[in-house]
Design a protein with these regions (language model features):
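Conserved short histidine dyad/triad with adjacent acidic residue
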Residues: 17-34, 68-69
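Short, charged/polar surface micro-motifs in flexible loops or helix N-caps
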Residues: 25-26, 44-47, 89-92
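Short acidic-glycine-tyrosine-enriched beta hairpin
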Residues: 52-69
Length: 92
């Protein structure tokens, strides 16, 4: 998906906080969760998410979707990664 189309989709789906970020290579983030829904599009590099006993690697062009409160750990790839991320507060 093209970045502009991804950002437009985020806005349509109520993701108000949208930014492009970079993550450094090889960093491991232990198990944690976020108070908001996250949706990200990996632009370059790769990351591996460990969630509910399973691991999945995401590369350029892949979309990551995490619901608020989902516990996960992250391992940045050997070259790090860049991504567009949207955050949405969960509906009460």
């Amino acid at each position: 998906m093209e970045p502009a189309a991804f950002e437009a989709q985020l806005k349509r789906d109520g993701f108000a906080e949208i930014e492009t970020k970079s993550a450094p290579p090889g960093v491991f983030s232990p198990v944690h969760s976020h108070a908001c829904d996250l949706r990200a599009l990996v632009m370059t590099g790769e990351l591996t998410l460990h969630c509910q006993g399973a691991s999945q690697t995401y590369r350029a062009g892949d979309m990551v979707v995490l619901a608020a409160g989902s516990e996960h750990a992250e391992l940045n790839g050997p070259e790090g990664y860049t991504y567009i991320v949207g955050r949405r507060q969960p509906k009460l």
